[in-house]
């Protein structure tokens, strides 16, 4: 398969402590996958400047095509993503006029004064661009560095989703000429362990992703959801998935499995 790697960095103590479920990473992962990227790693770091710098630097060193972060762009003392990204890139923070104008307009419309804490959200790494946030205040941060698209989004889910879409539609440079496709088989009466040798052989033969998801207890009434997925040229990946599906169906038949239309 062709791979256009992507990485996700989540910033927030609340995620590490378990207080907040990392739904942002799930959404970003699904969205990038739908574009043809292969998400290789999700990194979660605390609200600590050194940890944020390390998270970005390590991701950059692995040279993916795109890095998307969420969290840490707000006005409070523990919102440190802009500073961490700047240090990771070896540049200074600067007052970005576009970001400043975006923020000023939103507060002015509500007759709210622009305090230093609110102005903080307009400081971006040197060379970065502000990404419109139509659902909140803090703009996203976009910078193209060493052939990597880097985007920092707010942590509030609806704001993250909006900034991510604005980035994809207007700024993303590295767009894979690939299509992500997947298909599913639902089967009863076949244990995951019994199907495992067939899956292993097909993965090796076709260089494709096959994942069995057990939906019940294996030793009682086994039910499996089988996912077949891959990225590549659309027609090629369609043909490959169809071949894999047919061979899996043959294996399921040998194992006396019962095919279902859905779970």
Curated annotation (Swiss-Prot):
Gene3D superfamilies to which the protein is assigned, alphabetical: MoaB/Mog-like domain
Domain of life the protein comes from: Archaea
InterPro entries the UniProt entry points to: CinA, CinA_Arc, MoaB/Mog-like_dom_sf, MoaB/Mog_dom
Pfam families membership: MoCF_biosynth
Recorded family membership: Belongs to the CinA family.
NCBIfam families for the chain: PRK01215.1
Protein name in UniProt: Protein M1627_2099
């Amino acid at each position: 398969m062709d791979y256009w790697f992507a990485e996700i960095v989540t910033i927030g103590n609340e995620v590490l402590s378990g207080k907040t479920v990392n739904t942002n990473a799930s959404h970003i992962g699904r969205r990038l996958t739908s574009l043809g990227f292969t998400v290789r790693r999700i990194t979660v770091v605390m609200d600590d400047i050194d940890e944020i710098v390390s998270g970005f630097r390590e991701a950059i060193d692995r040279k993916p095509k795109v890095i998307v972060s969420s969290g840490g762009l707000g006005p409070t003392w523990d919102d440190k993503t802009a500073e961490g990204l700047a240090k990771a890139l070896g540049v200074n923070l600067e007052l970005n006029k576009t970001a400043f104008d975006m923020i000023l307009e939103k507060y002015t419309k509500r007759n709210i004064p622009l305090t230093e804490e609110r102005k903080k959200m307009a400081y971006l790494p040197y060379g970065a661009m502000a990404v419109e946030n139509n659902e909140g205040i803090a703009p996203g941060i976009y910078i193209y560095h060493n052939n990597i698209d880097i985007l920092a989004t707010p942590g509030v889910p609806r704001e993250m989703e909006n900034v991510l879409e604005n980035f994809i539609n207007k700024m993303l440079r590295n767009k894979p000429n690939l299509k992500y496709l997947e298909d599913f088989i639902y089967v009863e009466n076949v244990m995951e362990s019994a199907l495992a040798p067939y899956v292993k052989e097909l993965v090796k033969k076709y260089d494709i992703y096959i994942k069995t998801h057990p939906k019940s207890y294996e030793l009682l009434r086994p039910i499996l959801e089988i996912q077949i997925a891959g990225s590549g040229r659309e027609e090629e990946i369609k043909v490959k998935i169809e071949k894999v599906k047919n061979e899996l169906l043959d294996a399921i038949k040998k194992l006396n499995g019962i095919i279902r239309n859905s779970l």
